[in-house]
Regions:
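Glycine-rich, proline-tolerant flexible connector loops at the mouths of alpha/beta enzymes
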Residues: 33-57, 112-119
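Conserved N-terminal beta1-alpha1 strand-loop-helix module at the mouth
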Residues: 17, 21-27, 34-41
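Mobile, glycine- and charge-enriched loop segments
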Residues: 1-4, 9, 62
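Conserved, mostly hydrophobic/aromatic
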Residues: 5, 22, 30, 56, ...
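Active-site acidic/histidine proton-transfer and metal-coordination neighborhood
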Residues: 17, 75-167
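Short N-terminal binding/cap micro-motifs at the start of the first secondary-structure element
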Residues: 11-16
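Active-site beta-loop-alpha junctions enriched in small/polar residues
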Residues: 6-10, 33-37, 68-71, 113, ...
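Acidic (Asp/Glu)-rich catalytic clusters
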Residues: 19-25, 44-67, 97-104, 138-146
Length: 167
């Protein structure tokens, strides 16, 4: 069995120090939350990505996956009625598929409860939001396939989100 640590619990440390700590206490990998690498993961440079890979390798770790995908930048949503918000969100989702591949991860775990929340009100509004989310996830699935990674949706408790609580 291999153990992976969600790196946001150590986000107060530099990434190399996160790696050193994880290795020292027996972890084999980090599950990286992209927001911990920069305020806008779309702007990570090849040099920064190489530095992340290097920090992992220096401690004998790998990147097991990416998670908490849509924390940054602010305002992302797969259910929003605003097409520009969804375009920005889908662009990030697709870029994160490439980032996962660049870091050697095989999996992206879509939790991000706030960014998938269904609107209140009429059932028709909620159905439309579900359809918008399905379209966003389908585009991310295509990008994941092209990058050679798997894009997963994480069912979350109803206290966290009202959308996708079971699979």
């Amino acid at each position: 069995m291999k153990l992976s640590l969600c790196n946001e619990v150590l986000r107060h440390l530099s990434f190399p120090r996160q790696c050193a700590f994880a290795a020292a206490v027996g972890y084999d990998a980090l599950e990286i939350a992209p927001f911990t690498l920069g305020t806008d993961p779309r702007r990570l440079t090849p040099r920064r990505i190489a530095a992340v890979r290097g920090a992992l390798a220096a401690e004998g770790l790998v990147c097991s996956s990416l998670h908490w995908l849509l924390v940054a930048p602010q305002g992302l949503s797969i259910t929003s009625a605003d097409a520009s918000v969804r375009r920005t969100t889908v662009d990030l989702m697709c870029r994160l598929c490439d980032l996962a591949a660049d870091l050697g991860a095989e999996v992206l775990v879509h939790g991000s409860p706030v960014q998938r929340q269904l609107p209140g009100g009429a059932a028709a509004r909620q159905d439309a939001a579900r359809q918008r989310a399905a379209a966003c996830l389908a585009t991310a699935a295509d990008a994941a396939h092209a990058a050679g990674v798997t894009y997963c949706i994480e069912p979350l408790a109803m206290r966290e989100t009202n959308f996708i609580n079971t699979v």
